[in-house]
């Protein structure tokens, strides 16, 4: 996984003016789990990568 994944998903969320809570809800995960992904505490699975790409309108490769 791209080492910048945490930074990228945080930036994409903030660029869209979304709170962590709202983004997590829309992505189907808890706010705590999204926070862990954004801080790099946990690595996500392929299914979450695909959902992020679809949600933010970017390719999985970009993430």
Give short role names for the model-derived ranges.
Residues 28, 47-62:
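DNA major-groove recognition helix of helix-turn-helix/homeodomain DNA-binding modules
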Residues 1-16:
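A short, Lys/Arg-rich alpha-helix, primarily the initiator
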Residues 8, 19, 45-48, 59:
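Residues that mark the N-terminal boundary/hinge immediately upstream of a DNA-recognition element
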Residues 14, 25, 54:
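Alpha-helical residues within the helix-turn-helix
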Residues 39:
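Short, conserved catalytic or interaction motifs in soluble domains
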Residues 17-36:
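Short alpha-helical DNA-recognition segment
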């Amino acid at each position: 996984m791209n080492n910048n994944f945490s930074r990228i998903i945080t930036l994409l969320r903030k660029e869209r003016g979304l709170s962590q809570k709202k983004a997590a809800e829309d992505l189907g995960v808890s706010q705590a789990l999204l926070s862990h992904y954004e801080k790099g505490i946990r690595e996500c699975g392929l299914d979450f990568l695909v959902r992020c790409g679809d949600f933010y309108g970017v390719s999985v490769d970009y993430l």
